[in-house]
Amino acid sequence: MAMSSFLINSNYVDPKFPPCEEYSQSDYLPSDHSPGYYAGGQRRESSFQPEAGFGRRAACTVQRYAACRDPGPPPPPPPPPPPPPPPGLSPRAPAPPPAGALLPEPGQRCEAVSSSPPPPPCAQNPLHPSPSHSACKEPVVYPWMRKVHVSTVNPNYAGGEPKRSRTAYTRQQVLELEKEFHYNRYLTRRRRVEIAHALCLSERQIKIWFQNRRMKWKKDHKLPNTKIRSGGAAGSAGGPPGRPNGGPRAL
């Protein structure tokens, strides 16, 4: 109530301001191209400390992000892997890398190991024989190592005389042998070699066939066995003088 009465009763007069043209003419308001207007603004900005601090913080942030984005110079390439050892030599432990060298990544190390050539197979390494090399190739059986009177040739045979099998003569071979036996029951070494080459048989086979054929011929003709007769004659001739013809001693 007191304030309203004061305002009503007081002799208050509204102030009257000159127009804007007078302010501009009397330099109350600076013009748009006035140099003092910009200078005052610069002084006002430099005197405001919080804005300056914010500017430094932004500069640090920009520098920090720039440092994160810049990767810098690329790292040097990793050293090449050592060459594989020659075949036949025992592999040695790899030498440690030098102090200044950078170790490659695990993926690069695996690629370097897989790129090394595989060891040569046993057939390409004749200078260094090994048990695996001998196991790769089967033993070779040459013609002179084969035996005709043996039924099968075993390349893995260790030793010892195998059991001989019965030789099966063909009809043509038996016919030629019977012809030769009809003309001559005993052969010379030269004739035996000729017949063996002609019939594709060995000398031993020709010799055994003629022995068996002579025994059969003697049996067919009922001739005495010369081997048994010669053995008995030798025994009777070697007896003591008191026993003539190998008889019992007289009492």
From Swiss-Prot:
Its signal peptide is none
Protein's name in the database: Homeobox protein Hox-B4
* Short sequence motif Antp-type hexapeptide: positions: 141-146
Organism listed in the record: Homo sapiens
Q: Which residues carry this modification: Phosphoserine?
A: 90
Which keywords does UniProt give here? Developmental protein, DNA-binding, Homeobox, Nucleus, Phosphoprotein, Transcription, Transcription regulation
Any GO BP annotation:
hematopoietic stem cell differentiation
Example GO molecular function term?
DNA-binding transcription factor activity, RNA polymerase II-specific
Q: Which family does it belong to?
A: Belongs to the Antp homeobox family. Deformed subfamily.
Q: Cellular component GO terms, alphabetically?
A: centrosome; chromatin; nucleoplasm
Primary subcellular site in the record, as a coarse category:
nucleus
